[in-house]
Amino acid sequence: MKIELQRYLKKKFPELYPPDFSFECNDGWFRLLLWLSRYLEMYITQQNEMAKSHPQNYLPVKQIVARQVKQKFGTLRFYSDGGNQHTETVIDYTTFISGYICEQTGNTIDVGYNHNGSVEVLHKDLAKNKNDFNFVDDEELRTILKNI
C-alpha cells in the first residue's frame, strides 16, 4: 500500500495501528480497511461507554491493536490483539468481502482469480494468465453490472 495511504490510516486510527506498523497489501483494499477501522473504533468506543454507564448489561471491549494486515490466498488478513467475538466476526466478514474486490484497483466488476501460482483477486485486465482466470461473479451478474 502506498505510504501516503498507510500514514493516513495510522494518523486517523493511532490506537489501532502502532506508529511502526506497515500494511502488506495493495491500494485496492484501502477503502475496505478504512471502513473496517472506522467501524472498529466506533464500536469499541460505544461499547466501552455503555459498559461504564450500564455495567450490569455491557462488558468493556479491549482496544484492538493490529499486528499484521496482509494479503494471503487472495484475501485480506487482519491479525490483531484485543476486541471480542463481535469484532472478530466483523474482521472475518471483511476478509470474505475482500475476495470480491481487486486488491490493486479496488474494482468490484470483472474481478476474479487464477488457480495456478499465487492467488490474487484482480481485475480481469490485470490477470497474469487469462486462460486460467476465474470470475468471482457469474456472467449474468457481470452483464447486469456493466449495463447499469
Predicted regions and their residues:
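Short functional micro-motifs and their immediate structural scaffolds
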Residues: 107-113, 131
